[in-house]
Amino acid sequence: MDIIYLLCFISLVLLLVFMYFTMLRKNEFEERLALYRPQHQLSQKREAYLKKVRKFRLWVTGIIIVIFLAPLFLYLVLMIQEGVEVLHLLFPDEIIGETLLSLLIPFLVYYLLSYVFKRNEKALHMLVEQMSDSDFDLLLKVKDSLFVLTRYNPPFVLCNKQLYFFIFYAIREIDPAKITDINWGYSKNGLYVKIKSPKVTRITMSRETLSYLLQIVEQYNSKIRTF
């Protein structure tokens, strides 16, 4: 059991480190996002889009709850029904400790995923509020190019001549004119795209979605290198 406990502990430490970089360490855009509050009434078309973004987030959160929190609730019900003393008679203290540690990890994963989807929803609201009509029309085209289950979770957004890439652990703001080259290839999760600006950004998207990204970058940088 010591090996199981060690693996759980290492997984917990790695998860906490990842949570730090995702939730606490913010770039300039994410710092602005943290201070953002909706200020303007949006058009009916934009409000309709944001409502569907919210529905997507709630739908994903519901799935996450079922997958990650159901085991924790079952364990708590068992503790209430049997009583803590009975559990101590049936299981040594170290087994109970390992079980609680293994249940803590799914709860933290749920918390992290919930944070990411809430952050992305807030960022989309902020960008949709600030973008031009042409940028919003492009956002809708990108939406239609995505897989039906991810249409309201775009990999990138163009707003006021800036590109915003939605990576899991961060949202990066990049000037398309500063992108030097774009490489791509196929992976298990789809089309794998590598963007240099000069910092390297890696993200996955469909080929059709990539075509919109290339159009944007070529519009601001005609010397862009693509592979």
Regions found by a protein language model. Name each.
Residues A170-E173, K199-T201:
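Short, surface-exposed beta-strand-loop junctions and turns on beta-sheet-rich folds
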Residues R172-D175, Y192:
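Domain-scale macromolecular recognition modules
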Residues Y111-R172, D181-N183:
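N-terminal recruitment modules of adaptor/scaffold proteins
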Residues H125-L138, D181-F227:
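Acidic, Ser/Thr- and proline-rich intrinsically disordered linker/docking segments
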